[in-house]
A protein has these predicted regions:
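Short, leucine-enriched amphipathic alpha-helices that occur as contiguous helical runs
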Residues: 110-118, 175-182, 327
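Cysteine/selenocysteine-centered motifs that mediate thiol-based redox chemistry or coordinate metal-sulfur cofactors
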Residues: 328-355
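Phosphate-backbone binding and catalysis cores of DNA-processing enzymes
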Residues: 2-135, 284
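Low-complexity, glycine/alanine/valine/leucine- and proline-rich hydrophobic stretches
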Residues: 259, 266-267, 274-315, 320-323, ...
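Non-catalytic regulatory appendages
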Residues: 228-282, 286
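Short, amphipathic alpha-helical interaction segments positioned at domain boundaries
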Residues: 96-107, 170-184, 188, 251-260
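A short, conserved structural fragment
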Residues: 73-83, 149-158, 227-234, 305
């Protein structure tokens, strides 16, 4: 058992402490000053839904523009769970090599996929006047996502199509990147477990698949390698691990008093322990349906509803009656939302909740 590696006394924390810690760690308690985009993106920004990365930045940084995802300090890659991610260019190795499998057979499969991507890229370069699909060029989408673990692929998703190109891979060794990826995971959605880290960082099965045996084995090895940096904590009858440097912040985290519209795939929502974030099964299935995910309404530390955007209209569905000042704060969030629309309006979906 992994916990045998940790002889320190187990710290007990409340759900409120844990949620407040995560919100503060991911800058949801107070917006950063303009321009501090890289700092806000330390755990990567999933960009699977139209411009989710920009809206995640908006929830954390002042004066974010609609084109923030194109900032020269960022690149797009296939990252954790095989999803499209916007990550700091300086941290590409963390989000690519950090997911490179230790198993030699799986590692060989990643390298083989990268070779296929190289051949496909050459095929395209050899026929510049022809539009070749990935399959026609000799590689499929799943192979490209696997090849991205080498760090040699860059992508650009424009909400309609995904283009990709080859670049020189990072020169770093994978092991430091693996450990750093786990640190960022624990800093953003910790305390957690190797099993949850395997799900969060995986990529073989795609965004919605369960972890493979190889991914779980790698996650266990990563936590063992970080033994001296981790501390075991207990919360809600469960045990998990956090960075030792975060222990006091976990125990003392004060409730957050802000209103934010979090996009689908937001770093705060990217944890496997969804029942901790949303205890009610009915609301959990509404926030994470089998179809397209909505965004989440965060009010003073709790997720209290969902929202969807179509052009300039934002439809908010609350799970409980909202105070007038909260509704006013939501409307202000919408008014400053960095979306390219000449008109922004909010629609309240009452359904069976008396607003």
């Amino acid at each position: 058992m992994l916990r045998l590696l940790f002889p320190m006394a187990i710290s007990s924390i409340t759900r409120e402490n844990l949620l407040a810690f995560r919100q503060r760690a991911t800058y949801l308690h107070r917006r950063l000053q303009p321009g501090r985009l890289v700092e806000a993106a330390f755990a990567g920004l999933q960009d699977s839904a139209p411009r989710s990365a920009v809206l995640a930045l908006y929830a954390r940084v002042k004066e974010v523009s609609p084109s923030a995802w194109k900032d020269s300090r960022f690149v797009q890659v296939w990252g954790p769970r095989g999803a499209v991610y916007v990550v700091p260019a300086q941290d590409v190795s963390v989000f690519t090599l950090g997911r490179f499998p230790r198993n030699p057979v799986l590692g060989a499969a990643v390298k083989a996929a990268a070779e296929k991507a190289k051949r496909a890229f050459r095929n395209r370069q050899a026929h510049p006047k022809r539009v070749l699909s990935d399959r026609a060029a000799g590689v499929n989408f799943r192979e490209l996502r696997i090849a991205s673990m080498t760090g040699a692929l860059r992508i650009e998703w424009d909400e309609a199509t995904t283009s990709w190109r080859l670049v020189e891979p990072p020169t770093e060794a994978p092991e430091p990147a693996r450990l750093e990826l786990a640190r960022r995971f624990l800093r953003s959605v910790g305390p957690s477990t190797p099993k949850e880290f395997a799900w969060w960082s995986g990529g073989w099965a795609g965004s919605f698949g369960s972890s493979t045996r190889g991914e779980l084995s790698d996650a266990l090895q990563t936590f063992r390698s970080l033994e001296k940096e981790l501390t075991e904590v207990e919360f809600e009858g469960q045990r998990g691990w956090a960075l030792r440097t975060d222990r006091s912040r976990l125990e003392r985290a004060a409730p957050v008093e802000t209103v934010r519209l979090l996009p689908a795939g937001d770093p705060y929502l990217a944890s496997a322990d969804r029942a901790l974030l949303v205890p009610q099964p009915r609301f959990r299935s509404e926030l994470w349906p089998k179809s397209v995910w909505p965004g989440a309404l965060l009010v003073n530390g709790e997720l209290v509803g969902t929202w969807r955007r179509q052009l300039g209209r934002v439809t908010v569905r609350a799970w409980r009656p909202l105070e007038p000042e909260v509704k006013e704060a939501v409307e202000e969030e919408v008014s400053w939302m960095p979306i390219e629309s000449t008109k922004k309006e909010i629609r309240w979906s009452t359904r069976d909740v008396p607003l």
